Amino acid sequence: MPVGSVKTLTLGSHGDTMVPVPSASSVDGKPLTEVLSEAEIEPLVTRTRNGGGEVVALLKTGSAYYAPSAAAARMARAVAEDTGQVMPVCAWVDGEYGIAGVYLGVEAEIGAGGVKKIVERDLTESELAGLREAAGAVRAKQADVASL
């Protein structure tokens, strides 16, 4: 299957509390949940959370910098050209998804000046719970740093 026919979304933080969003994913324009069963999706969610380590292991030297570099280039273009493109970014969350006071990976409209607005999706209960768990993990890390 061509990579370009698969569209996915991941929110939250990086690592164990990463939140792959199957409800916002598609294959050839069809919702992922219509293409694969829950039993087929769950291992993909787990592999996505652990994917950074897999990429680093395959590269043997260096790190998993290709995707972040491509994303940074897309963001820079969106800011420079004031496109208003919606993309996943790390942004200050202030009430969206019932979460406030933390930087978190969410979808946002990007243009001149950076984040214009956070775009909230309708998440499933488990996706929303995962996003809230990610926010808690980020807050805990912030508290660790603040205590230094």
Name the predicted role of every residue range.
Residues M1-L148:
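C-terminal substrate-binding/catalytic lobe of Rossmann-fold NAD(P)-dependent dehydrogenases
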